UniProtKB/Swiss-Prot annotation:
Function noted in UniProt: Component of the serine palmitoyltransferase multisubunit enzyme (SPT) that catalyzes the initial and rate-limiting step in sphingolipid biosynthesis by condensing L-serine and activated acyl-CoA (most commonly palmitoyl-CoA) to form long-chain bases. The SPT complex is composed of SPTLC1, SPTLC2 or SPTLC3 and SPTSSA or SPTSSB. Within this complex, the heterodimer consisting of SPTLC1 and SPTLC2/SPTLC3 forms the catalytic core. The composition of the serine palmitoyltransferase (SPT) complex determines the substrate preference.
Gene name for this UniProt entry: Sptlc2
Keywords assigned: Acyltransferase, Endoplasmic reticulum, Lipid metabolism, Membrane, Pyridoxal phosphate, Sphingolipid metabolism, Transferase, Transmembrane, Transmembrane helix
Superkingdom of the source species: Eukaryota
Cofactor(s) needed for function: pyridoxal 5'-phosphate
Activity regulation, free text: SPT complex catalytic activity is negatively regulated by ORMDL proteins, including ORMDL3, in the presence of ceramides. This mechanism allows to maintain ceramide levels at sufficient concentrations for the production of complex sphingolipids, but which prevents the accumulation of ceramides to levels that trigger apoptosis.
Protein name: Serine palmitoyltransferase 2
Source organism per UniProt: Rattus norvegicus (Rat)
Enzyme class at the top of the EC tree: transferase
């Protein structure tokens, strides 16, 4: 694959390794001062002048080996063939499991599902359904307790055995800074607020559900983000899906990254605006859409678009990649578009102060028109926020469906957010927040480096706490999840349709609560399972650096 300007060659289904430092927009094309692109086993170096990036920006998307891709398609073909065979046997009542057959009283009903979706659920998903929705019965901290369950009808239903699998290492929760716990100052403060305010508000903010705690939280969020004002919501998903329709509508254009979260996709669709998709993190693709939007305008009428809104995420939760924000902002300014940044996974998890991807790149928050994030991950709570200009927030207070109609956030949840955010900012009189941010960065670099040394294909940015490990073949999705649980490691496995059909993966989420001993235990088991299932596909395995200390990460800017 020929690298595009700026070292961005992240195309589907082809993948390539890449790292970019100090890029800039020049004459409409993205340049970079140092870039490394690896494709088909070859390394290309590009050196040009530039100055957008103040720190190294390294992301890896190794190309799927051809043999693995072919075998993955063959695996799906075999499963599909046996699926049709099982449907035939069910039709003639030879198949002993009858849960997938239609009930007599519903035979004349209109189907709820499309044919392919129905077939996929019956014959492929059900084979590995036991890997999802596992119930836990403890705080989702570094370790969790899982309720054991069994199925006697091929995963169509489950029964609890009464046993508890204790001390399972939790590599799946978004507990980035370790605030998901039931002891400590945050939990004590939330318990006190519960005594004063109760558990719920039973009203909307527009009526009698606007507490002083809401005002305190929003002022704190605005100060934390470095913006004029902020507005909070009780649900993170609705923060996207219900606010985007308030910002754009008919006659507006949305430019959305192809890997954006479902909440952004739903919000864009509900808005009624025209939607165009650009390739993931590909600035050339985005710039082409911006140029076309300005040159050609709206379809048929050719009138100028009322607004152009760019939708991106800070950390992409399935890829582990980080948005190329300096380049996006440069393009946004050049073509006079608006920028909507979803920091659900990056807020708290990136940057020397934990203020997200804007802090990570050392950018000005005022360059982002709409800053969105959630409290469900780094803050160990629930809900979401929108930050920006005061005029924007005042407008959303009266036009956002989530602000006008939804019940306001629970007081104990708000106190959890307030206390944890003050801890991150250092306003609690301790350095705990700073230590958690640093610990997460160290854990991320260490875990990613060790997996690459073992020979696994790992996606994403080297600073992203979301670590996708590629499994590819459908049979290995269930096998990996089950084998890891046998070894007391809880992981999340993901397959089609949440990922491309040949890019099934396991997704690890690092936490500041993970100690080196916990990570080493998990890595040892992952290494053994990788050998057992033959998952070490990488052709670019780095040599282990035995003399490198564990405490290796620094947020000091790299000299150009």
């Amino acid at each position: 694959m020929r690298p595009e300007p700026g070292g961005c060659c992240c195309r589907r289904p082809m993948r390539a390794n890449g790292c970019v430092k100090n890029g800039e927009v020049r004459n409409g094309y993205l340049r970079s001062s140092t870039a490394t692109i690896a494709a088909a086993g070859q390394i290309h170096h590009i050196t040009e002048n530039g100055g957008l990036y103040k720190r190294p920006f390294n992301e890896a998307f190794e190309e799927t080996p051809m043999l693995v891709a072919v075998l993955t398609y063959v695996g799906y073909g075999v499963l599909t063939l046996f699926g049709y065979l099982r449907d035939f046997l069910r039709h003639w009542r030879i198949e002993k499991c009858h849960h997938a057959t239609e009930r007599e009283e519903q035979k004349d009903f209109v189907s709820l599902y499309q044919d392919f979706e129905n077939f996929y659920t019956r014959n492929l998903y059900m084979r590995i359904r036991d890997n999802w929705n596992r119930p836990i019965c403890s705080v989702p901290g570094a370790k969790v307790d899982i309720m054991e369950r069994q199925s006697h009808d091929y995963n169509w239903s489950f029964k609890y055995t009464g046993n508890i699998i204790k001390g399972v290492i939790n590599m799946g929760s978004y507990n980035y800074l370790g605030f998901a716990r039931n002891t400590g100052s945050c939990q004590e403060a939330a318990a006190e607020v519960l005594k004063t305010y109760g558990a719920g508000v039973c009203s909307t903010r527009q009526e009698i559900g606007n507490l002083d705690k809401h005002e305190e939280l929003e002022k704190l969020v605005a100060r934390f983000l470095g913006v004029e004002a902020a507005l909070t919501y009780g649900m993170g998903f609705a923060t996207n899906s219900m606010n985007i329709p308030a910002l754009v509508g008919k006659g507006c254009l949305i430019l959305s990254d192809e890997l954006n979260h479902a909440s952004l996709v739903l919000g864009a669709r509900l808005s009624g605006a025209t939607i165009r998709i650009f390739k993931h993190n590909n600035m050339q693709s985005l710039e082409k859409l911006l140029k076309d939007a300005i040159v050609y305008g709206q379809p048929r009428t050719r009138r100028p678009w009322k607004k152009i809104l760019i939708l991106v995420e800070g950390i992409y939760s399935m890829e582990g990649s980080i948005v190329r924000l300096p380049e996006v902002i440069a393009l946004k300014k050049k073509y006079k578009a608006y920028l909507y940044l979803d920091e659900a996974h990056s807020i708290g998890a990136l940057g020397p102060s934990g203020r997200g991807v804007v802090d990570y790149f050392g950018l000005d928050p005022e360059d982002v028109d709409v800053m969105m994030g959630t409290f469900t991950k780094s803050f160990g709570a629930s809900g979401g926020y929108i930050g920006g200009k005061k005029e924007l927030i005042d407008y959303l207070r009266t036009h956002s469906h989530s602000a006008v109609y939804a019940t306001s956030m629970s007081p104990p949840v708000m106190e959890q957010i307030i206390t944890s955010m003050k801890c991150i900012m250092g306003q609690d009189g301790t350095s705990l927040g700073k230590e958690c941010i640093q610990q997460l960065a160290e854990n991320t670099r260490y875990f990613r480096r060790r997996l690459k040394e073992m020979g696994f294909i790992i996606y994403g940015n080297e600073d992203s706490p979301v670590v996708p490990l590629m499994l590819y073949m459908p049979a290995k999705i269930g096998a990996f999840g089950r084998e890891m649980l046998k070894r007391n490691i809880g992981v999340v496995v993901v397959g089609f349709p949440a990922t491309p059909i040949i890019e099934s993966r396991a997704r690890f989420c690092l936490s500041a609560a993970h100690t080196k001993e916990i990570l080493d235990t998990a890595l040892k088991e992952i290494d053994e399972v990788g050998d057992l299932l033959q998952l070490k596909y990488s052709r670019h395995r780095p040599l282990p650096l035995l003399d490198r200390p564990f405490d290796e990460t620094t947020y000091e800017e790299t000299e150009d």
